[in-house]
Swiss-Prot record:
GO terms for biological process: cell adhesion; regulation of blood coagulation. Pfam families: Ornatin. GO terms for cellular component: extracellular region. It comes from Placobdella ornata (Turtle leech). This is Ornatin-D. It is found in: Secreted. Potent inhibitor of fibrinogen interaction with platelet receptors expressed on glycoprotein IIb-IIIa complex. May prevent blood from clotting during either feeding and/or storage of ingested blood. Keywords: Cell adhesion, Secreted.
Length: 28
């Protein structure tokens, strides 16, 4: 089941993407 990430989760996800690290909360 895929849960749409909240705004905070999207920002968190983006920060991890910039660091080049996989995010465990949402798949980027």
């Amino acid at each position: 089941i895929y849960v749409r990430p909240t705004k905070d989760e999207l920002l968190y996800c983006g920060e991890f993407r910039e660091l080049g690290q996989p995010d465990k909360k949402c798949r980027c």
